[in-house]
């Protein structure tokens, strides 16, 4: 039987899944009051970068410090599911359900988000700073030119796998994290975020959401998609309004 460990990234106390494969981890723990969970500041870590890397400080910790056949990451308010009905907390993906999925493939992903009228690039540029992706492309051009075609293809796509949620065979996660953090650490050297808002300063977490599909496409990886549940109520009117406001107030960008 394969061993599986899935971290649940959180910055606050929250209800957690009961299945033993889940490990709640406090991200940004180096600069916060302990919550009683595993801390991303233990062992080899980049906890100090949490303000800019978001949940990736948890992913880095899992990559460097956990030993399992499969590793994954979800969020305290977002979980995988294969069930359509019933109480959300009773529908969170279990080890028994996951075992059936990983018999078919090595990577589990959330169903893709489709922006329909936006490309991945334009959506990011409307919400953040286009230069983040432009400099990411430069990093790839310099260090990983074999990824450029996949990057351009993903930037022009209207859909993608978001949320930084996945469960991968250890070998796949090793390859992905080695590449991802090498790209992000180089991007960090080149990108000036001194004038960014607190939200936009989370740039490396945002960029990484767009890089997962680049890695998948460049390496011709197969995967299985399953739904994601948001554990709280969402106000879709406000969410849609904010989306429209970002478009109307968007910064200029070329693409």
Which residues does each predicted region cover?
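ER/Golgi luminal nucleotide-sugar-dependent glycosyltransferases, focusing on the catalytic module
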Residues: 1-255
């Amino acid at each position: 039987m394969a061993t599986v460990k899935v971290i649940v990234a959180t910055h606050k106390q929250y209800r957690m899944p009961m299945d033993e494969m889940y490990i709640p981890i406090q991200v940004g723990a180096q600069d916060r009051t302990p919550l009683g969970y595993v801390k991303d500041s233990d062992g080899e870590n980049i906890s100090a970068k949490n303000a800019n890397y978001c949940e990736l400080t948890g992913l880095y910790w899992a990559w460097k410090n956990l030993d399992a056949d499969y590793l994954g990451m979800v969020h305290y308010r977002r979980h995988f599911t294969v069930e359509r009905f019933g109480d959300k907390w009773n529908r969170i993906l279990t080890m028994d359900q996951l075992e059936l999925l990983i018999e078919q493939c090595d990577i589990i992903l959330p169903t893709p988000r489709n922006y329909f009228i936006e490309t991945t690039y334009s959506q990011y540029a409307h919400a953040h700073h286009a230069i983040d992706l432009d400099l990411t492309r430069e990093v790839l051009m310099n260090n990983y030119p074999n990824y450029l075609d996949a990057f351009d293809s993903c930037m022009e796509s209207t859909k993608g796998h978001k949320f930084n949620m996945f469960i991968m065979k250890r070998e796949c996660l090793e390859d992905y994290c080695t590449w991802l953090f090498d790209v992000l650490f180089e991007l960090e050297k080149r990108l000036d975020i001194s004038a960014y808002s607190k939200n936009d300063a989370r740039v490396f977490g945002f960029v990484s959401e767009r890089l997962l599909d680049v890695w998948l496409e460049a390496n011709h990886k197969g995967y299985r998609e399953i739904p994601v549940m948001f554990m709280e109520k969402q106000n879709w009117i406000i969410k849609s309004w904010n989306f429209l406001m970002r478009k109307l107030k968007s910064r200029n960008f070329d693409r």
